[in-house]
Amino acid sequence: MSRKASLSGFHEWLPAERLVEQHVLDTLRRTFELHGFAGIETRAVETLGQLLRKGEVDKEVYAVSRLAEDEEVAAGRREPKDPADPKRLALHFDLTVPFARYVVENAGHLAFPFRRYQMQKVWRGERPQEGRAREFTQADIDVVGDGALSPRYDADVALVMAEALGALPIGDFLIRVNNRKLAEGFYRGIGLEDTAGVLRSIDKLEKVGPEEVARLLQEEVGASPEQAAQALALADIRTSDTSFVERVRALGVTHELLEEGLTELADVVATLHRRAPGRAVADLSIARGLDYYTGTVYETVLVGHEQLGSICSGGRYDALASKGNRVFPGVGLSIGVTRLVMRMLSQQMAVASRSVPTAVYVALTADEDWSEAQDVAALLRERGIPAEVAVSAEKFGRQIKYADRRGIPFVWFMGRDDAGARVHEVKDIRSGEQHAADPADWTPPAEDLLPQVARAQD
Amino acid sequence: MSRKASLSGFHEWLPAERLVEQHVLDTLRRTFELHGFAGIETRAVETLGQLLRKGEVDKEVYAVSRLAEDEEVAAGRREPKDPADPKRLALHFDLTVPFARYVVENAGHLAFPFRRYQMQKVWRGERPQEGRAREFTQADIDVVGDGALSPRYDADVALVMAEALGALPIGDFLIRVNNRKLAEGFYRGIGLEDTAGVLRSIDKLEKVGPEEVARLLQEEVGASPEQAAQALALADIRTSDTSFVERVRALGVTHELLEEGLTELADVVATLHRRAPGRAVADLSIARGLDYYTGTVYETVLVGHEQLGSICSGGRYDALASKGNRVFPGVGLSIGVTRLVMRMLSQQMAVASRSVPTAVYVALTADEDWSEAQDVAALLRERGIPAEVAVSAEKFGRQIKYADRRGIPFVWFMGRDDAGARVHEVKDIRSGEQHAADPADWTPPAEDLLPQVARAQD
């Protein structure tokens, strides 16, 4: 992590770091599959028309073009294309927009409600800052229905993510839940009709503080000081149970949409409070910048690392995907895997027990033993023990050093007894202990079989 | 597979198809790790300077640019860039060139010989044809040394790939091995100095036949009819053991480089013949188009699907990566995962036993049982059994249909006995068999636990 990326914003991990990332991805996948989510991948490129459909112009998009075509344009042999041509190709900047397209295209082949997970790289041409990569991996789950989708899924997906994050060596986290209808209904109830504008200002609350947001609300949305104060009073409400409902009612605002949002959020928070106590709160300051959310919205902070921003965000979208009159409402959450792994590595929250999968390094006493040593390794691998074979009969000290540099715990020796018969011994190079072993039945302790990724000691 | 890609050359799988691809990737990863290869990923983008360093101009490269910049250029507010600017970004078209850069950049942090696997998407802006995707996944293994690398690794990597491919439900395959030194030494020995030109012509042998290649050799490389005949006689040699050596000698050509190549190839083929009988042959027609190979080269055909082209190719490269005077010779092989999976799916060589991970669908008798049903599912998941819970107490027929459409084998029912106590039953919806079960200890048969991907019946 002290290494500098050779291209700013494009991070690459060393093998031991990649093991931490792989552990995160494997753990997430395992949890998602235990909950019945099917894995899919979508292509890395979308048309600009698709990507910008929901007005996501604030995302810095990477366009893609065939080099041969660019050269023909530069040479005057081809007409330049409009850079904003909706048919132009660009790299996806999240997995939700591509998933919505996938659902619409494949609706006839999918069973709804469709539960899917998707773990892929995405790209944004942003200015790189700490925690802002230009290439990063997201891990998403979504449930999408055909026509309608039970509100129970709003709690379900958050519970799955709570379980997934809880299985990672990252310590405490808190899922903060709000509801767009609640917020929009409240704003309308106090006479602010530009609800998107209010949300944009409220979204800046943690960054700039309440006074600045009050000023923004008055200057940019035309709120009165009283309206600004009420919007801020709403955003100040945060409870771990459904008591937020009373606190909202105490503000004395009424609106049909507000009622709907209160009911929905109370249902979600009650379920989370019961099934994942301490993992979630109702937090009415959560806005989520994205236009396509229509109900529940989520953000997640890593406790003690709040300035990192949200590590797992999402929401309910009732109209992101549609095909003629047919709509596919969905709800989902997305983990920023790269952001999380960068933090895990830079803070040494988790470490891999070695840098290679190998558990046993089979040493060579004589060069011509190589094939027999491969037989030993093959016997070990048959029982799931990763093994490598030396390629030449160097001094044992050098062969042990090969294992030591990689953190390989065991070195296997093939010798001869006084009668000239083959004898096998295995050495734990950490303790120096060495004893006779049979390649057909020796096994290492379970914790040495594969590289372990664990929370580092505090 | 009958679906048409919405962007030509960019394939996306349905969930059941993705399970086949995932099975391929999991199997490869497992084999690579058992052999001590460490997984890494490199960024999707490289600079054009890196990508085109080895003269790979025949690959159609996708350039990447920030849309915002393109728009400024179009509006005349920014100078257009040279499309061939070596600092320009582009998507990688293979994993070998990026890996070479990674090794050079991180040499101080890696232990050599460095064994790594890498499974990622790559992109080529080619005209899509059957089997030629514009976005596809490659699975590579390479071993790279610091200064020198034992020739034993040339056999080692081929054996690992033979084991990996042998673990896939794809039937027979054959790794065809040749050696650049052997071929180049032979061509020089018969007086043909433009060895790259000869290789380019020989590379077309399977496509256009020997007569056309003879014509090409004479027209494009300036060979005499006798020289062309000798080059073709070499390419005609194919043996499963080291007897190719005698057959080459019988052609009466001598050259120092030829001798070196014969020795190297004989060593590799002898090892493969002994340790993976029937999986590999010496095939002196194998040329490999890429410039960077310097010794052993490999291609692999799927028996009965030869027209698909090579599914696993690679070779030894002694000079791809260097840093000042320090060189990092390597040898590796790359599986064309997408090409292979497309064939597996289109020929129905393998099928997934269901389209979702879920083994048990917990039905609801009453809406208010949802949380208790989640407790049942949680108990199952604790034992590694993927489970989903219904969100509403629809008619049992509809709930069973939900499971049936997805291929979920078991439906769990929560009822009450006459005394009002909770009773659990589980139904195998394939046989209709239903019996009492305890959520704390019931387990499905091993073959129903997770989706199975198996070779389809012939």
From Swiss-Prot, chains A, B:
Enzyme superclass (EC): ligase
Gene Ontology MF terms: ATP binding; histidine-tRNA ligase activity
Catalyses which reaction(s): tRNA(His) + L-histidine + ATP = L-histidyl-tRNA(His) + AMP + diphosphate + H(+)
GO BP: histidyl-tRNA aminoacylation
GO cellular component: cytoplasm
Coiled coil: none
Subcellular location(s) per record: Cytoplasm
Location (main, coarse): cytoplasm
Keywords: Aminoacyl-tRNA synthetase, ATP-binding, Cytoplasm, Ligase, Nucleotide-binding, Protein biosynthesis
Enzyme Commission number(s): 6.1.1.21
PANTHER family named among the record's database cross-references: HISTIDINE--TRNA LIGASE, HISTIDYL-TRNA SYNTHETASE
Quaternary organization: Homodimer.
Similarity comment text for this entry: Belongs to the class-II aminoacyl-tRNA synthetase family.
Entry protein name: Histidine--tRNA ligase
Classification of source organism: Bacteria, Bacillati, Actinomycetota, Actinomycetes, Micrococcales
Gene (UniProt): hisS
